[in-house]
Regions:
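Acidic, low-complexity, intrinsically disordered interaction modules
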Residues: 25-41
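Short, mixed-charge low-complexity intrinsically disordered segments
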Residues: 37-72
Length: 72
């Protein structure tokens, strides 16, 4: 599969995102993300992070958008 894949790091929770939570799943300027151009790379890094003690992580495939998301 081609595309851009991310493993997100949520600044609010100070942890890698391993489930979709309303305040963390979408990439914002306050969060950082590990970006991969290939799914294989993302899976390799996910496995390393999980082996280092993180819970099961989610790999997100994201598309570029100009939609502004506001926190309430």
């Amino acid at each position: 599969m081609t595309g851009i894949y991310y493993i997100l790091y949520c600044a609010a929770a100070d942890a890698y995102v391993y489930e979709e939570r309303p305040d963390c799943w979408q990439y914002t300027g306050q969060d950082t993300a590990l970006r991969f151009s290939a799914l294989r790379e993302a899976k390799k890094t996910r496995k390393k992070l999980e082996n280092d003690g993180f819970p099961p992580l989610t790999i997100f495939k994201m598309k570029q958008t100009n939609t502004v998301i506001k926190k309430t």
